[in-house]
Each structure stands twice: as structure tokens, then as C-alpha cells.
């Protein structure tokens, strides 16, 4: 298990950190709110709070881009 969480937990995805690594420095502070929709053996699937079409996959390689929101 990547981190201790359950379906419905809220996270902030620091997408700007990933984008800035690829040269998009203007997006460095981009943060997206999302919530856990499914937990797999090797990944956690999160869905955007704004758009049900956007899904993000937290893996061992990307888990530092996510910050758990405290309720």
C-alpha cells in the first residue's frame, strides 16, 4: 500500500511540480483538489473535484506530488 487512505479521502495534487520539471515553469504553483475513488495494489486512483472526467494515478514514483487534506 502506498499510503494509508480510504475511498473518499481528499488530496491536493501539486500538478505544477510535475509540469515545471518538463519546462512549464509558469504552471509551477498549479494545485488541483481531488478525492480517492479506488485503491489498487500498486496505485491509488483519484478523481478531480471539479471534473468527473479527470483522473489521476498516484504511484510510488508520483506520491510526493500529493498532499492529504486534513478534515
Where are these regions (language model features)?
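Surface-exposed loop/turn positions
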Residues: 6-9, 43
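Short linear sequence elements within intrinsically disordered, low-complexity coil regions
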Residues: 16-18, 29-30, 61-62, 71
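Mixed-charge, Lys/Arg-rich low-complexity intrinsically disordered regions
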Residues: 1-7, 14-19
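Basic/aromatic-rich interaction segments and small domains that mediate binding to polyanionic partners
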Residues: 20-56
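A detector of low-complexity, intrinsically disordered, Ser/Thr/Gly/Pro/Ala-rich segments
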Residues: 1, 10, 37, 57-60
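Intrinsically disordered, low-complexity, charged/polar segments
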Residues: 47-71
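Intrinsically disordered, low-complexity segments enriched in small/polar residues
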Residues: 9-12, 22, 54-55, 64
Amino acid at each position: 500500500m502506498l499510503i494509508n487512505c480510504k475511498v473518499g479521502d481528499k488530496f491536493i495534487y501539486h500538478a505544477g511540480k510535475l509540469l515545471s520539471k518538463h519546462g512549464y515553469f509558469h504552471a509551477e504553483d498549479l494545485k488541483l483538489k481531488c478525492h480517492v475513488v479506488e485503491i489498487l495494489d500498486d496505485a491509488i486512483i483519484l478523481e478531480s473535484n471539479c471534473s468527473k472526467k479527470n483522473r489521476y494515478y498516484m504511484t510510488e514514483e508520483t506520491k510526493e506530488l500529493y498532499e492529504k487534506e486534513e478534515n
